[in-house]
């Protein structure tokens, strides 16, 4: 059970790199149309100290400074920072508990992912890029009030093998080995959600079978350039 605790402290030089990354990617959430206003949130996880470096609550992304980024424990207790952390800190904590390899979480209210979430439809394998989430489809968690432990627990129960998740009548989230990976997955799933929605408007989309998706998932593991040494 995730508990809600707060303690506010000042900023040190700890996690300067992570703070900068969160500020930079927060701006990209807006410029790449993955969210609007102050909705959505971003975090990076330190697995050794079990700490989350997370965006603050209610500050526009282009107004957010590195000093606004908050460091909290998985219990929501603030370790460093003067700002209130994102209202969805428990959602992020639940993802790090569900996905031990995850080092970043991006939560958005991107248009087409949110449309499917309002239909309570998963992102199906209408386009093979869904396999980037590591599963044949991206599930949709049941609706729970935003910023609650109940939402966090529902998301944790629903995500399964996927690295992305729709939140009914709310939005989506993506996890990754680093912030760039989580952000890229969120962007990719928005593409897949748009393709699916547009196909649904035109007719009945053909969904790729699970065996083909498993093949694509395996091929994705070797996709891209191989690092030497």
Spans of model-derived segments:
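N-terminal amphipathic/basic-hydrophobic helices that include classical n-h-c signal peptides
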Residues: 1-13
């Amino acid at each position: 059970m995730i508990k809600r605790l707060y303690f506010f402290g000042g900023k040190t030089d700890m996690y300067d790199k992570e703070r900068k990354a969160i500020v930079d990617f927060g701006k990209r959430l807006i410029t790449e149309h993955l969210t609007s206003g102050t909705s959505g949130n971003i975090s990076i996880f330190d697995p050794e100290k079990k700490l989350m470096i997370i965006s603050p609550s209610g500050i526009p992304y282009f107004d957010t400074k590195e000093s606004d980024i908050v460091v909290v424990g998985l219990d929501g207790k603030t370790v460093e920072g003067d700002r209130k952390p994102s209202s969805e800190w428990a959602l992020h904590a639940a993802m790090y508990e569900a996905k031990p390899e995850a080092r970043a979480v991006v939560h958005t209210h991107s248009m087409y992912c949110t449309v499917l979430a309002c239909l309570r439809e998963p992102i199906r394998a209408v386009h093979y890029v869904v396999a980037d989430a590591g599963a044949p489809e991206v599930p949709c968690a049941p609706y729970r009030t935003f910023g609650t432990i109940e939402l966090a627990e529902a998301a944790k129960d629903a995500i399964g093998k996927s690295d992305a998740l729709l939140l009914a009548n709310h939005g989506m989230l993506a996890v990754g080995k680093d912030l760039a990976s989580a952000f890229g997955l969120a962007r990719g799933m928005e593409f897949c959600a748009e393709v699916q929605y547009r196909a649904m408007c035109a007719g009945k989309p053909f969904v790729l079978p699970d065996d083909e998706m498993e093949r694509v998932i395996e091929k994705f593991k070797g996709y891209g350039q191989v690092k030497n040494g």
